[in-house]
Regions:
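Inter-lobe coupling/hinge segments of SF2-like helicase ATPases
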Residues: 47, 61, 65, 73-76, ...
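Upstream accessory/linker segments immediately N-terminal to the RecA-like ATPase cores of bacterial MutS
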Residues: 1-70
């Protein structure tokens, strides 16, 4: 079970073999359920969206960057899926910064202009807030209400959001696994966008199966796991790949070097001087404060923060 320590079995017993057999049986059941779901979706009729409205055209024209060829191709494929009879189930693969979020925003707005609600499911609280700000800013000039749900929204604020969602006053809701909770009720859900589906646990995916049966689904990922790709390759899911980087984007440089304080100082100083941020990954919580102190000593002007899995939600935020 996720979130619990594995049980140690006594040697010379059949306990481990029994556990393996149960796991194999459960995996087969899940695989069969998924295949049934995808077969049902392929053979069922979903909502057929209307051709693009003038608002859709205005939204896409207001994009401040030039669309890449793969962005245009993926957007067109998604529109054809949404305007078709069968429920959409498309996987969009692309590196970070290659424009997947813009594609998702266009798909979401297309659903909204046909009076449908959109759920955007993300794996982390911080990402839900980032997406909320991005969607809200991008759609601020259009008739579209965007809101969010995560563990930081509680009390009256959460109750109000849930009521607005059920009444249909919210067009796009962005959230973590809380979006598949028992209290969530949609008036007219038409599109589900899932960001990095492989990062969700089994319990969330089981709930997703019931939601996805008759709803268009768009999955975004930068790192698809083999099973996700396999579903696309076998035809259960349609696949769009974004390979072309945005104009003037430099490729990511990866260097492997021995630990050296001068290299760390120079790299951090350079990034800060150009207005950027640095993500320094350390592999032990026990001495992470000492590492933060080292960075502060090397680059006195830097503002250094610490984040790890033993901090509570408020501290991380």
């Amino acid at each position: 079970k996720e979130g619990t320590a594995p049980k140690i079995h006594r040697l010379g017993t059949n306990a481990w073999q029994n556990t393996k057999n149960k796991t194999k049986t459960r995996v087969k059941e899940i695989a069969f359920d998924l295949l049934q779901l995808y077969a049902k979706r392929k053979n069922s009729k979903g909502f057929q969206y209307s051709p693009d409205t003038y608002l859709q055209t205005e939204l896409e024209a207001s994009f401040m960057y030039e669309d890449t060829p793969d962005q245009l191709t993926s957007t067109q494929a998604i529109k054809e899926d949404m305007e078709g009879e069968a429920p959409m189930d498309r996987l969009v693969c692309g590196d970070v910064g290659f424009g997947k979020t813009e594609i998702a925003i266009r798909a979401a707005f297309k659903a909204v202009t046909d009076s449908k609600q959109v759920a955007v499911l993300v794996p982390t609280t911080i990402l839900s807030l980032q997406h909320f700000k991005t969607f809200k800013e991008r759609l601020k000039e259009f008739p579209c209400k965007v809101s969010y749900i995560n563990r930081f929204k509680t009390g009256k604020s959460l109750t109000q959001t849930l009521k607005e969602l059920e009444d249909g006053d919210i067009d796009i809701i962005i959230g973590t696994h809380a979006l598949v909770g028992k209290r969530i009720k949609f008036k007219n859900l038409g599109l589900m966008i899932i960001d990095e589906e492989q990062k969700f646990g089994v319990a969330v995916k089981d709930k997703l199966k019931t939601l996805k049966a008759n709803v268009d689904t768009l999955t975004l990922t930068a790192t698809p796991i083999p099973r996700t790709l396999q579903f696309s390759l076998m035809g259960a899911r349609d696949l769009s790949i974004i390979n072309t980087p945005p104009p003037n984007r430099y490729p990511v440089e990866t260097e492997l070097r021995p630990f050296n304080e001068e290299v760390i100082r120079d790299a951090v100083s350079y990034e800060i001087s150009r207005g950027g941020q640095v993500y320094f990954v350390h592999n032990r919580i026990g001495n992470i404060k000492e590492v933060a102190g080292m960075i502060q000593r090397l680059v006195p002007d830097a503002r250094v923060g610490i984040g790890h899995g033993q901090l509570n939600g408020e501290q991380l935020e």
